[in-house]
Amino acid sequence: MIRNIAFDLGGVVLALSYEQAVRRFEEIGLRDSRRHLDAFEQKGIFGALESGQITAEDFRSELSIMVGRELTMEECYTAWHGYVDHVPRRNLEAILDLRARGYKVCLLSNTNPFMMQWANRDFDGEGHPIGYFFDAMYLSYECKVMKPRREIFDIMLRGQQSLPEETVFVDDGPRNVEAAAAMGMRTLCPQNNEDWRAMLDEVLACKERESID
């Protein structure tokens, strides 16, 4: 029986805009930003930030060297926020409904302090922080490890007190989904901003039928 549902953030809960992020970083001076940015797993100082190896201030300092001028924290925040297109209300309502139905619902995300600064303020445009929608959040920069490493999935499963076979993992990153499936989780891999509600309902209904049989 499924008891635990883990959601990725970018591309699943919120709609991503990779091109907007590229433009924002170019605007602050990172001319080759497309080479540095990724939609699923960051590298270089971007990956170091999201894996908790460096702080937000370290990132600001390192990026300042890369662009050849002193950047402010606000400029870094604005650039990172370029990844956010919008937060579909349908997703938030579906997540709250899953919790009301008794599922444990958590966030499992490769993210960083700049993104969470925004998400912890007013995630839905109605004054609710992102934590309002989840039972727990497992963030790469706090866990000190990024998906698709097994360790971050283990941290999530321990925190949720759930087995892999009791868990559905929803992520738009194919490598992340493959890693979760290899551990025994049921997985969904929607495209960025795809409506995943019917797909998830089908997985949950299928598992419920299996448990009855």
What would you call each of these model-derived segments?
Residues 101-102, 133:
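Structured helix-beta-strand junction loops
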Residues 99-100, 181:
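Anion (oxyanion) recognition and catalysis
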Residues 96-99, 157:
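A structural alpha-helix within SAM-dependent methyltransferase catalytic domains
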Residues 102-104, 185:
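A generic structural motif
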Residues 28-29, 51, 71, 95, ...:
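Surface-exposed beta-strand edges and their flanking turn/coil or helix-capping segments
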Residues 107:
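Phosphate-binding loop of NTP-binding sites
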Residues 1-3, 7, 112-113, 117-213:
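Asp-based, Mg2+/Mn2+-dependent phosphohydrolase catalytic module
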Residues 2-93, 100-101, 112-116:
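N-terminal helical cap/lid subdomain that shapes the substrate entry/recognition surface
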